[in-house]
UniProtKB/Swiss-Prot annotation:
Gene Ontology MF terms in the entry: methenyltetrahydrofolate cyclohydrolase activity; methylenetetrahydrofolate dehydrogenase (NADP+) activity
Gene: folD
Catalytic activity: (6R)-5,10-methylene-5,6,7,8-tetrahydrofolate + NADP(+) = (6R)-5,10-methenyltetrahydrofolate + NADPH; (6R)-5,10-methenyltetrahydrofolate + H2O = (6R)-10-formyltetrahydrofolate + H(+)
Keywords: Amino-acid biosynthesis, Histidine biosynthesis, Hydrolase, Methionine biosynthesis, Multifunctional enzyme, NADP, One-carbon metabolism, Oxidoreductase, Purine biosynthesis
Free-text function comment from the UniProt entry: Catalyzes the oxidation of 5,10-methylenetetrahydrofolate to 5,10-methenyltetrahydrofolate and then the hydrolysis of 5,10-methenyltetrahydrofolate to 10-formyltetrahydrofolate.
Pathway: One-carbon metabolism; tetrahydrofolate interconversion
Subunit structure: Homodimer.
Name of this chain's protein: Bifunctional protein FolD
Organism: Streptococcus pyogenes serotype M5 (strain Manfredo)
GO biological process, one term: tetrahydrofolate interconversion
Native organism taxonomy: Bacteria, Bacillati, Bacillota, Bacilli, Lactobacillales
Keyword Oxidoreductase part of the UniProt annotation: yes
Length: 284
């Protein structure tokens, strides 16, 4: 019988532990970790994500600021908001909610964030730290997945890990983190041939393609570990993953649900990285 990898439970445990650490930092150093979230436009999904992050930050005792900006804001004005938070010593983490409107260059916005406060881990300087084996700020979804694998005693050394999706947010950093644990990694994408055959070789399969129930049990080797990063809506508005959960659970040894798997861990790692940034600020 398959084991459920419960990201919600682990995230709650981590947040309880983090709340104690935040209180200790406040008592000993007089520092409260500060997180600034910048939302441009009124995309419904982005609004939900931002509210969840704000709620979680307040729950663990952070200072939380959310800036909601018009979708018509110009790039220079957005950068000015970021620079204000770069200079604010009470803010230790800055997050610009993606996606941004088409007239704004994502790369320039990411470059505008102080790498020490880039809790999303997207700045090229943080990417370089990750690639060189000295990670500082790591994209939150891949780091959350690594925590899940550790918590559920998944030994990655020598295992074949297949990742579906090569984005800078999940796929590429995920590959590096797995390599650092001595896994053998295959990174697949929309041009990969014989994808089903490649997936059936995976000891660990990580799916991040944004297509609801794309992965069926035909893609899964008996006893594999399946991590579903997808968040999609079906025709009835129900939240579903990229993996057809019920049938894949028949063959997988361990599997994450959607919701309640990877999503809560992404927020947990965002909070942890903000706390670590605040902690580093005490050593200046």
């Amino acid at each position: 019988m398959t084991e459920l990898i419960d990201g919600k439970a682990l995230a709650q445990k981590m947040q309880q532990e983090l709340a104690a650490k935040v209180n200790n930092l406040k008592q000993k150093k007089g520092i409260v970790p500060g997180l600034a979230v910048i939302l441009v436009g009124d995309d419904p999904a982005s609004q939900v994500y931002v509210r969840n992050k704000e709620r979680a930050a307040l729950t663990v005792g952070f200072k939380s600021e959310t800036v909601r900006l018009s979708e018509f804001i110009c790039q220079e004005e957005l950068i000015a908001v970021i620079e204000r938070y770069n200079a604010d010593n009470t803010i230790h983490g800055i997050l610009v909610q993606l996606p941004l409107p088409n007239h704004i260059n994502d790369k320039k916005i990411i470059l505008a964030i102080d790498p020490k406060k880039d809790v999303d881990g997207f700045h090229p300087m943080n990417t370089g730290h990750l690639w060189s084996g000295r990670p500082l700020m790591v994209p939150c979804t891949p780091s959350g997945i690594m925590e899940l694998l550790r918590e559920y005693n998944v030994n990655l050394e020598g295992k074949h890990a297949v990742i579906i999706g090569r984005s800078n947010i999940v796929g590429k950093p995920m590959a590096q983190l797995l390599l650092d644990k001595n896994a053998t990694v295959t990174l697949t994408h929309s041009r990969t041939r014989q994808l089903e055959e490649v997936c059936r070789c995976a000891d660990v399969l990580i799916v991040a393609i944004g297509q609801g129930h794309f992965i069926t049990k035909q893609y899964i080797k008996e006893g594999a570990i399946v991590i579903d990063v997808g968040m999609n809506r079906d025709d009835n508005g129900k939240l579903i993953g990229d993996v057809a959960f019920d049938e894949v659970a028949e063959v997988a040894a361990k599997i994450t649900p959607v919701p309640g798997g990877v999503g809560p861990m992404t927020i947990a790692m965002l909070l942890e990285q903000t706390y670590q940034s605040a902690l580093r600020s005490t050593h200046k």
